[in-house]
Amino acid sequence: MDKLVITGGKRIEGEITASGSKNSSLPIIAATLLSGSGTFTLHRIPDLQDITTFRQLFDHLGAETAFSHNTLTITTANVQSVLAPYELVKKMRASIYVLGPLLARFGHARVSLPGGCAFGPRPIDLHLMAMEKLGARITIETGFIDAVAEGGRLKGATIDFPVSSVGATGNALMAAVLAEGTTIIRNAAAEPEIEALCHFLQAMGADIRGTGTTELIIHGCDSLRHVEFSNIFDRIEAGTILAAAAITGGSVTIRGVIPSHMESVLQKFSDAGCRIETTDDTVILKSTGRLKATDITAEPFPAFPTDMQAQWMALMTQAEGTSEITDHVYHERFNHIPELNRLGAHIDIEGNRAVVHGPQALSGTKVMSTDLRASASLVLAGLVAEGTTEVLRVYHLDRGYERIETRLQNLGAEIKREKYSEFG
């Protein structure tokens, strides 16, 4: 098993190009199952464990994939199986994304109930509700979702989501593009990753109106074509790198971004005392002195993203004053707090709100990763902690960050990856 060993006290400074987005890559890859023609070529796909897991799932389904230098090619003509087995799905909740495409293309899908990050309940009820609205008969038995399209093809419908859900919106969208008739998705997630999925489906020939809004109108079609497509940048990775510069009193330039996708995060960095500059595809953060305590509330886009909540909490341990961090998306996403407190932070939990008392001098020790973004928060804390911090179980981190230790090394961090055994 791998761990990251970090010697704190080095400033993060320099220039870097943002990686491709994991959270848009996964639904885009899933959407290739909607077409049985030709070979898809997808650029700017991050080299992550979740991408590897998805490729293994596609191999099981009968697709052919190849990955090199962040370009993924996929041929789906020979896909025959509609079974996504537990052995693969348990590794990653996003495997549920194959439900909509398989059901839309073949009229049947059998997908194991998903696994993934270990914080709080993240039910798939909204995914199943959307499939049922489109005419699927859903049964759950022996740990599998069995979905069958009545009459062999899904039918357009109006889907009103009671709460915004990126995953359910993506699944409904992919199912609807091959459904007979018109589908309206209300209270759709408007995250940039859903917008990117819409653009990909439109390139394939789908008729989608309302891209980038909370109401999507989809006119179903009979078939879709293979395309070449470039993925968007990873706004969460970019935000994490900005936080690394801010927590160490450094400065960083990130190229290949879309600043409008990060407005809420950039505003909070500014509120916290950092100087932020942007161009069409670049964001620059410069530290200006002591950080100021700044409250955040994690909510659906365009608000502050829940996937940056843990990193912001680490940052606020070094800010002057008391900050409140509330998560309205995942109320129990606070597994990182005990580990941050082990490093010397002073953070209290009050329901779905955390109160961070800063600034606190952090001291390096061994800490345990519990999920993807919690891991990132511990790395950030390690960058500023006195002495050596060991972040264990970094396989969580590898699910969402492409060689983060190398990228941080290139910006001045003293960080390395080592093997270890949990049994001695």
UniProtKB/Swiss-Prot annotation:
CC terms in the record's Gene Ontology section: cytoplasm
Record bears the keyword ATP-binding: no
Signal peptide positions (record): none
Binding residues annotated for UDP-N-acetyl-alpha-D-glucosamine, in chain numbering: R93, R122, P123, I124, D125, L126, D307, V329
Reaction it catalyzes: phosphoenolpyruvate + UDP-N-acetyl-alpha-D-glucosamine = UDP-N-acetyl-3-O-(1-carboxyvinyl)-alpha-D-glucosamine + phosphate
Localization in the cell: Cytoplasm
Active site positions, chain numbering: C117 (proton donor)
Residue numbers of 2-(S-cysteinyl)pyruvic acid O-phosphothioketal PTMs: C117
UniProt keywords, alphabetically: Cell cycle, Cell division, Cell shape, Cell wall biogenesis/degradation, Cytoplasm, Peptidoglycan synthesis, Pyruvate, Transferase
Example of a GO MF term: UDP-N-acetylglucosamine 1-carboxyvinyltransferase activity
The protein's annotated pathway: Cell wall biogenesis; peptidoglycan biosynthesis
Matches recorded under Pfam families: EPSP_synthase (PF00275)
CDD domains reported in the protein's UniProt record: UdpNAET
EC number(s) on file: 2.5.1.7
Residues that, per the record, bind phosphoenolpyruvate: K22, N23
GO biological process: cell division; cell wall organization; peptidoglycan biosynthetic process; regulation of cell shape; UDP-N-acetylgalactosamine biosynthetic process
Main location class: cytoplasm
Record function comment: Cell wall formation. Adds enolpyruvyl to UDP-N-acetylglucosamine.
PANTHER family: UDP-N-ACETYLGLUCOSAMINE 1-CARBOXYVINYLTRANSFERASE
Sequence similarity: Belongs to the EPSP synthase family. MurA subfamily.
Protein name from the UniProt record: UDP-N-acetylglucosamine 1-carboxyvinyltransferase
